[in-house]
Swiss-Prot record:
InterPro entries, per database record: ExoRNase_PH_dom1 (IPR001247), ExoRNase_PH_dom2 (IPR015847), ExoRNase_PH_dom2_sf (IPR036345), KH_dom (IPR004087), KH_dom_type_1 (IPR004088), KH_dom_type_1_sf (IPR036612), NA-bd_OB-fold (IPR012340), PNPase (IPR012162)
Protein name, UniProt field: Polyribonucleotide nucleotidyltransferase
Pfam families associated with the record: KH_1 (PF00013), PNPase (PF03726), RNase_PH (PF01138), RNase_PH_C (PF03725), S1 (PF00575)
Originating organism: Staphylococcus haemolyticus (strain JCSC1435)
Assigned keywords, A-Z: Cytoplasm, Magnesium, Metal-binding, Nucleotidyltransferase, RNA-binding, Transferase
GO terms assigned for molecular function: 3'-5'-RNA exonuclease activity; magnesium ion binding; polyribonucleotide nucleotidyltransferase activity; RNA binding
GO biological process, one term: RNA processing
Residue ranges constituting the S1 motif domain according to the UniProt record: 626-694
Entry's Gene Ontology cellular component terms: cytosol
Amino acid sequence: MSQEKKVFKTEWAGRSLTIEIGQLAKQANGAVLVRYGDTVVLSTAVASKEPRDGDFFPLTVNYEEKMYAAGKIPGGFKKREGRPGDEATLTARLIDRPIRPLFPKGYRHDVQIMNTVLSADPDCSPEMAAMIGSSMALSVSDIPFQGPIAGVNVGYVDGKYVINPTVEEKEVSRLDLEVAGHKDAVNMVEAGASEITEKEMLEAIFFGHDEIKRLVAFQEEVVAHIQPVKKEFVPVERDEALVSRVKTLTEEKGLKETVLTFDKQQRDENLDTLKAEIATEFVDEADPENELLIDEVYAILNDLVKEEVRRLIADEKIRPDGRKPDEIRPLESEVGLLPRAHGSGLFTRGQTQALSVLTLGALGDYQLIDGLGPEQEKRFMHHYNFPNFSVGETGPVRAPGRREIGHGALGERALKYIIPDTTEFPYTVRIVSEVLESNGSSSQASICGSTLALMDAGVPIKAPVAGIAMGLVTREDSYTILTDIQGMEDALGDMDFKVAGTKEGITAIQMDIKIDGLTREVIEEALEQARQGRLAIMDHMLQTIDQPRKELSAYAPKVEIMHIKPEKIRDVIGPGGKKINEIIDETGVKLDIEQDGTIFIGAIDQDMINRAREIIEDITREAEVGQVYNAKVKRIEKYGAFVELFAGKDALLHISQISKERINKVEDVLSIGDSIDVKITEIDKQGRVNASHKALDENK
């Protein structure tokens, strides 16, 4: 990299975009500082000097949000940033996906991309700035990279598409779409939406791509000015004679028939056996001290299996489990499996199975999101777990990884739109999807299982949601789109395109590809084929349960809503929260109070709610002129008695208003603790209440 600072500027969605190179992080292979509005992101790219053994590309993308970027001090005892939160992890995955396909095939050097948010402007997306920064850091480095790429956020506000919508625009947008690609094609899509049609989604994707092409052209100008010298990478060539011999052996031993074993586990066993048998043919030729030849044979075998799977799909239109390209695996579904859970749904598609379990909580059980933006309260959560046994393996049990966080978030996006608001359903909702068996598309099975669990729990959802994953196999002059891909098709195909939605439209999509990009024609066809598959799955699910149950589980908490005047909130809370804590301690309820005076009372027992409501009504109750109360004498003075009309509200009963007869001393007729009927005669401007017993006698 050049050591001299260079600055390049352009305009992006009405705001200034600046790329600075040559001043910071000069020991990295590539480093850029991206300024977008008041957002500042440092992006660096570093590659190891030597390649790693193995047949995978060791790329790591990190995205770090420094709290000082938003003028905040981290919470917790240590007061410093910890491990990345879920949102940062999702952003790292978002950047990884469009970049990964653009490294040379066979490249095995460790590559680490670090994105550090140094300043955060809520209206200038740090995520999109980091994506451009990652692309630029790679492009101006000596690391082989077939970019640049760019990404944009697309909203849909008042019937118009918007690039990088502001915070206010996002609140009313029907679409939250992130799309990335290079100048020729789109290679990453992620979106949440409120029943967007396939046509609207397609237009949004390519509306975003038009802006991407402009940003890529800007980056190409920067690269042309910097003129980086790329390290030469020469992929390892296969020994053609060895490839030919191994291929002949696979044909003799029936590779096609082995691939077309319909059961996943049996197919895997048969393939392992076939590979082992062929490898033994070369054992005598291998140096006892060197296993490189055997490793090469296995690598060739893996390539040949991939080639055969793709050939069968592209040429013979038959898939490893015998299905046609647009055929869905057998479906099974069930609800109400767990008697003590508030809702449960089991969804099985072929050899993929997800159990989704729903829990209802009070509004106060929300998750607090404290990131670079304002604090947010999340009252709908979807979590996804993928245990080792789901694929017949053993291994350590760890905290959720990037994949589990990503799949959980995708399901959350797909279902968020159908969750009713608090005025209709005053609960916090958490769904956990346990993948019990997996052969591809487990994230979409979790969406289907979650919809079943929502209806089983009696949540009044706006509409059921189903999800499906689409695949792709490309040839030089043709392509085949696959409906409901299984594990082998995901691993050996060119695309994993997940689409979830209702009968009316899309609520979430996610597209990952292993090729350079997709044309408009392919995306349009995949969306339509996904729509047909989604509707077929929906029809099956509705045969199991066609609408939400009328009543909640007997074990679910009960929540009731009451309203008080906003100025009465302080009375319910009390000094330092004393009064509200007394109510909670006495009744055992959970209380959530909104600024408009709405109070949500939650408890497992109706009597607890009723008691809490009575206490709050007493606290917030107001005396009315002309109203008669049976009051209790609390204090006696020379000039009269103070009587309690109801909890928290006293009135003055003047000595002249006690009786029609003249009274010399209040104590002659009243004692502390006595009950007496009084009528409210006046409430002055300070809220002081005057009462009369004499007025009742006069009315007789």
